[in-house]
Amino acid sequence: MISCLVIIDVQNGFLTNETNNVPDRIKELLSREKFDHIVATKYMNHEGSPCYKQLNWTSLMTKESQALDKYVESISERVFEKDTYSCFTDEFKEYLKKENITDLHFVGIDTDCCVLGSLYDAFDAGYNYKVYLDCCASCGGKKQHDSAVVVMERVFGKQHLITK
């Protein structure tokens, strides 16, 4: 079994009062858990992205807002850019296959958007998975985070959701 910590979208544009504790919580997680691989994703909004076209969402369109948190960047062996909620781009799927990764461990921002979207794809693709809830948060606040947790419990099973 080969594990990979997948750090979802811990970027300057997503670090708010609601989410700014995520990098420190990831650091704490890494002090108690070991993973074979650590990768990160970056959400890249642009005029052709679904969020821009369908939601008219214009945030995260500058290099500064798209930049990864410095700590996350320093620990990630690879960074995968995406313009969808899920991290399961062709490049990401090829990486998982090449590295024979079987177990995905998710942390990051937003619990109710990109973490949840990636979890659906991990489940459908047959990966073993865990979500470290104390290392996730939502820019929309605790209510959105908690709502996503309710969905995750029902759809993916409480046994896959880890709290400190």
Q: Language-model segments: which ranges?
A:
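Metal-dependent catalytic neighborhoods of phosphoester/phosphodiester hydrolases
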Residues: S49-K53
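Short hydrophobic beta-strand that contains or immediately precedes a catalytic carboxylate
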Residues: V6-I8
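…and closely analogous acidic/polar surface helices at protein-protein or active-site interfaces
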Residues: E18-E33
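Active-site-adjacent betaalpha module
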Residues: I2-C4, S31-R32, H37, W57-K164
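Short, glycine/acidic-enriched loop or turn micro-motifs at the edges of active sites
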Residues: Q11-N12, N45, A137
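Short acidic, Gly/Ser-rich segments with clustered Asp/Glu that frequently serve as metal-coordination loops
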Residues: V10-E18
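Short glycine-enriched, charge-decorated loop/helix-capping segments at active-site entrances
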Residues: T19-V22, Q54-S59
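Von Willebrand factor
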Residues: E33-G48
